[in-house]
């Protein structure tokens, strides 16, 4: 099963749309991240695995693939952690639903850490019809600069 969430990466001060596609399928228990993922994104593997188990869920013991599209854009950010984790929980049947934009780096203990480049991302989200955004509490003041979205 696979799920997909909208997200972004920054090129200068411009937010570029990115789709975080998360797939879980039968096979060897490997975890791959594809789509020009930089070092901080590759390190998400350990943060996501630890955060899921620290939060009382089971990390899927199956083949796991995350595709960050478009592939031609290099991604050097850690805010894909949250949509990856939620995607794995949905795809493995541990959660039943989730929607909206989800942004945040995960600590090994499951704590949501703040992200950078938020205002251009939220403007992009609003332009694309997004209504709800899940983000770290530390980013709420900055998020308040962009009206028309509901923040959790």
Q: What are the residue ranges of the model-derived segments?
A:
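Peripheral, non-AAA+ core regions of ATP-driven protein-machinery
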Residues: 1-152
């Amino acid at each position: 099963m696979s799920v997909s969430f909208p997200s972004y990466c920054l090129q200068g001060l411009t937010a570029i749309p990115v789709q975080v596609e998360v797939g879980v399928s039968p096979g060897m228990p490997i975890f791959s991240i594809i789509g020009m993922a930089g070092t901080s994104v590759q390190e998400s593997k350990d943060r996501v695995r630890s955060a899921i188990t620290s939060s009382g869920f089971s990390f899927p013991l199956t083949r796991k693939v995350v595709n960050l599209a478009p592939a031609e854009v290099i991604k050097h950010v850690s805010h894909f952690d949250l949509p990856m984790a939620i995607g794995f929980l949905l795809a493995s049947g541990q959660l039943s639903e989730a929607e909206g934009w989800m942004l945040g780096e995960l600590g090994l203990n499951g704590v949501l850490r703040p992200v950078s480049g938020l205002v251009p991302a939220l403007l992009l989200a609003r332009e694309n019809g997004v209504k709800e955004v899940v983000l770290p509490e530390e980013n709420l003041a900055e998020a308040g600069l962009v009206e028309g979205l509901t923040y959790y």
